[in-house]
UniProtKB/Swiss-Prot annotation:
Organism field: Prochlorococcus marinus (strain NATL1A)
Gene of this entry: murE
Pathway named in the protein's UniProt entry: Cell wall biogenesis; peptidoglycan biosynthesis
One of the GO biological process terms: peptidoglycan biosynthetic process
Residues that, per the record, bind meso-2,6-diaminopimelate: R401, D425, N426, P427, R428, G476, E480
Entry protein name: UDP-N-acetylmuramoyl-L-alanyl-D-glutamate--2,6-diaminopimelate ligase
Species lineage: Bacteria, Bacillati, Cyanobacteriota, Cyanophyceae, Synechococcales
Binding annotation for ATP: G117, T118, N119, G120, K121, T122, T123
Amino acid sequence: MSRYLHTLLKAIDLQVRSGLANPEIKNLSTDSREIEKGDLFLGLDGEKVDGGTFWAKAIERGACAAIISKKASLLNPPTNEDPVVILPEPVSLFMGKLAADFWGKPSSEICLIGITGTNGKTTTSFLIEFLTTSLGHPSALFGTLINRWPNYEETSKYTTTFAVPLQAKLRKAVQAGVEYGAMEVSSHALSQNRVAGCDFNGAIFTNLSRDHLDYHDSMESYFEAKASLFRSHLIDDDGPRSVINIDDKWGSILAKELNKKCWTCSLKENSQIREKPDLYISNLQIMQDGYMGKLHTPFGVGNFISPLIGEFNLMNMLQAIGILVQRGLPLNDLLEALNKFPGVPGRMQLINMDGFKVKDGYPLVIVDYAHTPDGLQNALIASRSLTKKRLICVFGCGGDRDKGKRSKMGEVAAKFADYIVVTSDNPRQEDPIEIIKDIQKGITIDSEISVEPERSIAIQFAIAKAKKNDVVLIAGKGHEDYQILKDQTIYFDDREQARKALSLRTDVI
């Protein structure tokens, strides 16, 4: 795809200065080192370095023009003869809309659904992709684990891709025949305008609990970032285009603001916002391998069987089906497909369950991505429902991240687990022992606890210690296959470590 510079500038409401050339643009690039001939260089403003200062190197490498911020132009001033456009504000504010226009506004050609919240985004997005595909609608998935569409799949580097590659991926998905798209939308992405230029047909608010307070100043700031998906990026019309979890305090606030532009959903039949939630569950029965019950929507009621474990997954299921019913898909067809959902890697993943049974004498081992206090609590409660004896929890906290949540996660583990093994997660530049000390501040003195900074040894210890009918929950990393130690990233997979520990174990009955 190609466009001309002047056309793109007008698309973001910028006047074209006199004498500026109007070259044909072959592609967009934010990295001066990866420029190819005919590319338009976009000088992205970074936390430490303003990429716009490298405009001259981009031109040398073949860029037909560069767009930079005023700040970058002061650090490395261009002349009037240079093919450089100077923006009054950071380039990131314009990048999403510019990229969307360059790629022909691909999101407007599909039903794009955004999912935001602290926990539940990945499972909900996987559900949406699976259900729409099962009903014969080719779908795309953009999120924490993978980006994929028909005949293409790649491992994700970010929960939400940056604006320029995101629009390119959307165009490729449209070219592959996609009708629906499920996109995880992080608070970082919303704060950094990565989804500017995306037209969302629908949006889901899963929940909000403590996370990323190293980036956001407060829970209020964190909420404002999440809420911007519903205020600024949804297609604006009179009908409801969102589904909001009102069992969550912040969700209730958002639902009251959106009013009739949203459907409320709750695991309770009564609502403080409306007489009844728009989406809710009744006649719930817990089974060994999931749940069954009735799902209520404004468009009808249907019986469901869900293979997902944990009450929090009932909310994920309710929201995924709710948004698709809201967008016009038939409820009964969605509920029929639900029973075949294969689950999500690293999300309440049962490592050694075979035909709903665990080898005699062995514990059940579960790997989950839970890395926030709320997420850990949900995973522990779900794991408790599967154990007949002790619940053992292995977890740590990431380094160079929100330190305030560490003691809270220790407090949660002490409250809901019978035995705790505190270990490392991704310590990054911090000392693992110091992180563990922060976690221990929230753990009561009478708790049964072991400390082992080496994560592989901690997993092996917990599984060796567990007995028949115990459950071992390994929390924090889920699908991740790496560990970050100082400046080194090593291969590490909790699921592989768990299987190895199980194979080394002698029967303890």
